[in-house]
From Swiss-Prot:
Annotated PANTHER family: RPA-INTERACTING PROTEIN (PTHR31742:SF1), RPA-INTERACTING PROTEIN RPAIN (PTHR31742)
Keywords noted in UniProt: Metal-binding, Nucleus, Zinc, Zinc-finger
Cellular component, GO, one term: nucleus
Assembly notes: Interacts directly with the rpa1 subunit of RPA complex. Interacts with importin beta, but not with importin alpha. Forms a complex with the RPA complex and importin beta, which is dissociated by Ran-GTP.
Record's signal peptide: none
Protein name: RPA-interacting protein A
Organism in which the protein naturally occurs: Xenopus laevis (African clawed frog)
Gene of this entry: rpain-a
Top-level lineage group: Eukaryota
Protein's job: Mediates the import of RPA complex into the nucleus, via its interaction with importin beta.
First and last residues of each zinc finger (RIP-type): 144-219
């Protein structure tokens, strides 16, 4: 107890020396857990605000970084070296230290909120992409992604459209289902890193064979579909 009182007296009214290091490391850990946050976001779907305090990872990030810094000699004052983050909070009575942790928590919540808003845009774009594929596909027919007017004739050997598209697919064993899957996966994959809808075109390669390309002027992406 005496050590705790000396510690509080030493830093009373000043910024705790661990604050900036802990804050930076928490922010970095949250950003590194971006894919984990996206997975959690996908799992809850419409229950976006169902997490504790409206957060998905902030508490977990703060606890993990706390434990990581505990393992580094001298990183935290000895009074904090408890078995769990919650236990340490229970003994903290210094208003400056509590305010510091709350400040860090609020910053992390804002960072997480910004990431979630980005994820919402990504998921919205994915839905638009899927809608685009649905619009291209009617029953057992697919609208040509190049002209967006005529239905494609799809066989195991070729794909052809009245607009002039002709692609030899003999070596690929093409079908309506396979083409639909290729278009859907390509649009979804593009949507992970760009929010603009790409366009489709046909180009002849060096060997003389025609291929279907998907390209985007926004992100300069170009993908061979088939």
């Amino acid at each position: 107890m005496e050590a705790e009182r000396r510690h509080r007296a030493l830093y009373k009214g000043t910024t705790p020396p661990w604050k900036e290091t802990y804050r930076k490391r928490c922010v970095e850990r949250l950003k590194r857990n971006r894919s984990k946050l996206l997975d959690k976001f996908r799992q809850v779907g419409e229950r976006i605000h169902g997490g504790v305090g409206g957060s998905f990872l902030v508490q977990e990030v703060m606890e993990e970084e706390w434990k990581a810094m505990q393992s580094e000699n001298g990183s935290f004052p000895s009074m904090w070296k408890k078995e769990a983050f919650s236990q340490a909070l229970n003994i903290m009575r210094d208003p400056d230290e509590l305010a510091t942790l709350e400040e860090i928590k609020q910053e992390l919540l804002l960072e997480e909120k910004a990431m979630i808003e980005e994820f919402e845009n990504i998921l919205q774009f994915e839905e638009q992409c899927l809608d685009s594929v649905v619009e291209l596909s009617t029953g057992d027919q697919i609208v040509c992604p190049v002209c967006n007017r005529n239905y494609l004739t799809v066989t195991s050997c070729f794909i052809v459209c009245q607009c002039g598209v002709y692609i030899n697919t003999q070596s690929q064993g093409m079908s309506i289902e396979k083409l639909h899957s290729l278009l859907e996966s390509s649009l979804t994959s593009h949507g992970y890193h760009c929010t603009k809808l790409p366009v489709f075109s046909v180009a002849t390669e060096l060997g003389g064979a025609a291929s279907l390309f998907m390209s985007c002027q926004e992100c300069d992406a170009m993908v061979v579909i088939l």
